[in-house]
Amino acid sequence: PEWMPSGLVNLGLDLRGGAHLLAEVQLADVYASRMEAQWPEVRDALRSLTPVRREEAPAGELRVRLNDPSKMAEALQITRDLARPVTTVTGAGGSDINVSGANGTITITLSDAEKQATDERTMQQSLEIVRRRIDEVGTREPTIQRQGADRILIQVPGIGSAAELKAIIGTTA
């Protein structure tokens, strides 16, 4: 009859068997690598003003020590000029970095707007990578979706175990 749905009913993992995995995306590592990549640009920009050296800093933060602290104001301006505009989902613009200075040291961190934009980009890329790797295996009807701010839910029918699923995805998605 026409009133009956024509599509097939998708059986869940409980009825069909398969693997369920909740993967966490390491966003803090992305922030840290962004700051790592910022160092050569900052160093080269400040080199003509005064010699600089990198100082130990928490992950996701870059600290640069000026050899000549009297040039702090100029150094801060040069560093702020390295900032790029950020366009977020809301369309609000802002700078990608926060720059501050004290006692001859410049501290650079990612702005909240850049962290939000980076989170979105990283999660989208991670979802695409996981989806592509699972599709390569030819599994039918996998569920791959974002869950919360930094997690990806992966459910694949027909796969024997979570270990097998991890092997398909790989350790660095």
Kindly label every feature range from the protein language model:
Residues 1-173:
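A structural signal for conserved, well-ordered secondary-structure elements
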